[in-house]
Structures are given as C-alpha cells and as structure tokens.
Amino acid sequence: MRIVKTGCLILLIFFSVLNCGKKSKLLEGNWRGVIIIQTNSLKNEVPFSFSVLSNQDNYTITITNAEEKIEVKEVVISNDSLIIKMPVFKDEIRAKILSPDSLIGEYIHFGSRSNYNMPFYAKGNVKDRFFIGEEKPQYNITGKWETSVQPGEKDEYKIIGIFEQQGTYIKGTFLSTSGDFRFLEGTVSGNKIFMSCVDGSHTLLFKADIKDSTTIENGILVGSPNWQEKWVAVKNPNAELPNPESEVTVRPGYHTIDIRLNDLNNNPLSLEDERYKGKVTILQVMGSWCPNCMDETRFFAQLYDNYKDRGFEIIGLCFESKDFLQSKQRIEKFKHDLQAKYEFLYAGEVGKNNVLTTLPFLTDFKGYPTTIYLDKKHSVRKVYTGFSGPGTGKYYDKLKSEIINFIEKLLREQ
C-alpha cells in the first residue's frame, strides 16, 4: 500500500512538472481588448479589436482600427504569461492567460518623457468593439465637423472631425495642426457616439452626445491618465485649419543652413558632407514616439527609395528622452520596423525650446512632425507643420501628391 502511494505521489509530481513547463494556448479568431484609463476619479474603458492566428506554437496578433491592420509578430508565451510587443513603438501588453479565451494584465506605455501602466483585459470570440446596445441612431453624422477642444478655456484649440457613418457603425478621424488622430472606429447608438483607437502609441477614446443634425455636445476625449479633455462640434463642410505652410517660417538672414550633429554611432554629420552636398534634402523634425511621425516616415521611406538616385536625401531629427542609449534603441527599432533607409539622428530632448536651440533658423515650433524642405543650395524652400496620414483618406492622398510634385520641382532646378 505504501509503495502504491509513493508511486502515485511520484507520478503526480512528474505530471505537475510537465504541466508547469507547458505553454498556454490562445483561442484563434476575433478578440475584444480593453485598456482602462483612470483619469481623476473616473475609469474609462478604451476597447479595441484584434484577431489571433496560430502557426504551431507561434502566434500573430492583428489589431484593427477601421481600415488599419497592425500585424504584431512579437508575441511571447511562457507558461501562462503573455507578452505582446507592439511594432514601431515600444508599448507592450503583459498579461496572464486565465483560459484560452481570457486575458488579464496591463498595457505599458513608454512615452517620450514618462512611462505608465494601465489595466488591461481581453475576451476571445467577441467581435463587437463597444457594448452599448443596438439602439437605432437618431442622426447620421457623416461629414465635416468644426470641433472645439476645451471650449471656453484659455487652452482651447480647434480640430476638424471627418466621419463616415453607416447605420450604427462609424469611422473617421480628427484633423489637427500637427496631423491627425489616425484611424478611429466605433458605434452610434441613439444619440450617443463612441469611437476608439489603439495603435501601439495612441490609446484614444472619444465619446459625445448628438444634440441634432448639426450639433455635437458633451464630448469627452481621453488619451492617457493625464489627458482628458472636453469637446463640442458643429457641422461645417467648409471648416479649415490654419495653412500648415505658414505656421512656421525662417528667420531673416538665413539664406542657406547647416546642421552639425552626431549620428547614432557618434560620428559627426553635416549638410556639408559629401552625401548631402548639392542635394535636395528634407529635414524631418520628429520623434520615435509620435504616431503621425510614423505615418510620415512610412511615406518618406518610399519617397527616399524612389528619388535617392536622383540627388535626394532625408535626415530624421529625433527629439526623444534625456537618456541617449534608450533613445537610440527606440530610434533604431522605429527605423527598422518602418524599413526606412535614410539617416536618423538623436537631436536632443523633446520640447519646443530644444527644437529651436537645435534649429535656430526657425521662427517658432508648433508640433511633431515638422518638415523642412531644402533645395540643392540648402536654402529653406518650405516649412510644413504636421502630417495628415492615411486615416484622413483624401487629405492624405492630396498631401502625398503635393510632396512628390514639390520634390520633383526642386530636383529639376539647377
């Protein structure tokens, strides 16, 4: 009897050890993830949709925001622990696999100045982004909306909402002076709007009430534990933002310019170097933490490949954290994931004053990205604030055409 008990105990220990080293599985198919953003005393749930695909023991996760598909290949499972490493940016999800269709953990955001953790959970075999019922929408808000953020406050600013609504489904974005809020997707139920975006840097939630066919009120925008703002909007098909080419200009007396910085391997770099001498050059003021900079870099990577043999160069001037080594790692990941072959430099710590110290020929600085176009003599021909990315649809297509036409014009000049 004692021998039998001892044998059973050994078998139990043996199978327990085997089980401890066994990877947990994830359910394939549609999932609904939720990031909880605590702002003051309020908990805001930011939902997003993703799918899971398994290839033996390897998983690929695809995050969906309207037309955007973000393929995440760095998915690590160890026992019942899951780590999802976002492409391009450094954000991560760390979770415990409670069951094949259930996760709980945290979303870790690595910002330009600080990092923070937010609670996260997810459920498999769920397709809906928002759980708010199927009440028939009272209004269709497709169109262009002049939007005031923090209305009536001293820090009030203007953005433009562009929405497409079909039944209860809504998608769109907001244009701003620094670019756009990328791909938003959500639901209209009754007189209420809910839209969100999670893309590896943004964790955005927009919600509001539709007062009537031309007025949106009681809007709340949440982006982080320290970012919550009110917004209202009126429908205006003629709404426009300030001209992005007139926001920042060049100080008098700067006929040609130069920059002198070190590359990521600490080698000196100047516009007088043979690589840049006599070439049309873009100076891209950016950050590896900036979603609009990602959209611009993805386009610039193609632009560079198409025109580099015709005397065209781009230099990414990255404003990051104080820590050079951490910044270098982030810049290199950003460059690698976007397959950009042009030069990226660490230009200093993020902040307006630091940008103006590095680039003293600018009259002002309004936001990332800011793009400086130089002709073959390295005279500044244009300073463009912001970048309207693919989430803006026709505005993105128009901007790409304008950039290509302007580059070709500069290349034709003697």
What is each PLM-predicted segment?
Residues 339-343, 362-372:
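Structural micro-motif
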Residues 270-294, 300:
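Short active-site neighborhood of thiol/selenol oxidoreductases, capturing the structured segment around
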Residues 1-30:
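Bacterial Sec-dependent N-terminal signal peptides
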Residues 27-96, 130-132, 139-209:
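Central antiparallel beta-sheet cores of small beta-barrel/beta-sandwich binding domains
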Residues 236-273:
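N-terminal "domain-start" segment that seeds a small globular fold
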Residues 295-339, 350-358:
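Structural microenvironment flanking redox-active thiols in thiol-disulfide oxidoreductases
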Residues 116-149, 244-250, 256-258:
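Surface-exposed beta-loop interaction hotspot
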